[in-house]
């Protein structure tokens, strides 16, 4: 696990003390992997304190959302839509769409998310996949 991934896991453990992340391949997008919540994470009842902590700092980036996976697969099948272009992944989460766009030939991809841990996840996942992304926490500060 890379230093970025270790940092990401440590941040996750502030909310979910026993949670770990692992590099996982994605279905139907063979050459893309993400650091996601370990699939065997305990599914036992949580205390009210744990639930409150999760509500206050939801870690949306620990899952690959179906819409992101579908978009990544679509970009694989239709790279001409992003090849040679500048792309914004708004609400990037784990960065799956940003990474897929970069792999499909986008000149620059900006992963934008208000959650600093999501941006850390994007950085760790970009590193895992050997791509370079740009990052922004504020859409309004992006320049053309």
Regions found by a protein language model. Name each.
Residues 144:
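Short SAM/SAH-binding signature in class I
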Residues 48-57:
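Glycine/charged-rich beta-loop-alpha catalytic/anionic-binding loops adjacent to active sites
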């Amino acid at each position: 696990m890379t230093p970025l991934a270790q940092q990401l896991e440590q941040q996750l453990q502030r909310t979910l003390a026993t949670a770990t992340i692992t590099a996982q391949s994605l279905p139907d997008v063979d050459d893309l992997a993400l650091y996601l919540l370990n699939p065997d994470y305990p599914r036992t009842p949580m205390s009210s304190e744990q639930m409150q902590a999760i509500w206050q700092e939801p870690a949306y980036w620990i899952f690959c959302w179906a819409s992101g996976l579908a978009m990544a697969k679509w970009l694989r099948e239709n790279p001409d839509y992003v090849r040679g272009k500048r792309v914004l992944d708004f609400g990037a989460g784990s960065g799956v769409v940003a990474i897929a766009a970069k792999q499909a030939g986008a000149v620059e991809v900006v992963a934008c998310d208000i959650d600093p841990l999501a941006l850390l996840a994007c950085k760790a996942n970009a590193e895992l996949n050997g791509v370079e992304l740009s990052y922004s926490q504020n859409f309004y500060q992006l320049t053309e």
